[in-house]
A protein has these predicted regions:
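ATP/Mg2+-dependent ligation/transfer catalytic cores
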Residues: 1-150
């Protein structure tokens, strides 16, 4: 957290996107002035649970996954993911791990099951502990993106 604070001062970042991945793979999150970095790093930010499902609604107009009456999730930034955006030097971004609201009746402050990055981290840690191996994955570039002669 301290290193990121120093980097924010050095680079002149004045706004940070606190981001996470939705269940559809979309990057979503909340923008907060960089002056609040230390506080957000310790306490987190709150956002509606439905944001993990892109705030989509079903055909009846109800949020998918969580009702409008639900509490808000808590996002805690992962400082090692912080970087300054190359196309707008005033802005930084950091990925976050999501947790259930601290005031929930069931599992307060627990891991949020709709947090894709958090789930992957937990599953990978279990896998490493059980098998003493690392999961690795890669992408297969689609060759149809390329056209002969270009």
């Amino acid at each position: 957290v301290k290193q990121v604070s120093e980097k924010i001062k050095e680079t002149g970042v004045d706004y940070i996107y606190f981001q996470f991945i939705s269940v559809t793979g979309r990057i979503v999150g909340k923008g907060i002035p960089a002056a609040h970095w230390v506080c957000i790093s310790e306490k987190g930010f709150q956002l509606v649970y439905g944001s993990t499902a892109n705030l989509y609604v079903d055909r009846h107009g109800d949020y998918i996954g969580y009702g409008a009456e639900s509490s808000e999730l808590v996002g805690i930034p992962d400082p090692e993911t912080f970087c300054q955006l190359p196309w707008d030097k005033r802005i930084g971004r950091v990925f976050c791990t999501l947790f259930r609201n601290r005031e929930e009746q069931v599992n307060p402050g627990g891991a949020l099951t709709s947090d894709c990055r958090g789930n992957l981290r937990r599953i990978h840690n279990e896998f490493q502990g059980k098998h003493d191996l690392n999961m690795r994955c890669g992408t297969e570039p689609e060759m149809m993106w390329l056209k002969r002669g270009e």
